[in-house]
Amino acid sequence: TPFECGAFTSLYSKDAVEEGFAQGKVLFFAGGTGHPYFSTDTGVALRAIEMDADCILLAKAIDGVYDSDPKINPDAKKYDTITIQEVIDKQLAVVDLTASIMCMENHVPMAVFSLNEKDGIVNAMRGKINGTVVTA
């Protein structure tokens, strides 16, 4: 995290992250950048680009990317896959615009899935995405 956040986290250090990866550890980035005006999506995109990540796993309050807000439109269609450019062009706001552009320009795909799904994070880490894969 970019700030002190209790016993379960450490302050972000690129060197410490690289050391953790070298030791085969699974690391989570939390807390965004620690600066106002930047979302947690942008923070994770920044860290993923810095660390040359293969992809970003985004656990959200929604279970994927939809063509419209499923809370408003009961007929909203969930995408299994979509490109970042399509997300931007269609103004699908599940991932913020800055993070989307950063990921597109740096060829970092994303997987969007529900934070509330049982074993959702573990499944996503195993490549079993029950959500939307957003390709760069």
Predicted feature residues:
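C-terminal catalytic "cap/lid" subdomain
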Residues: T1-A136
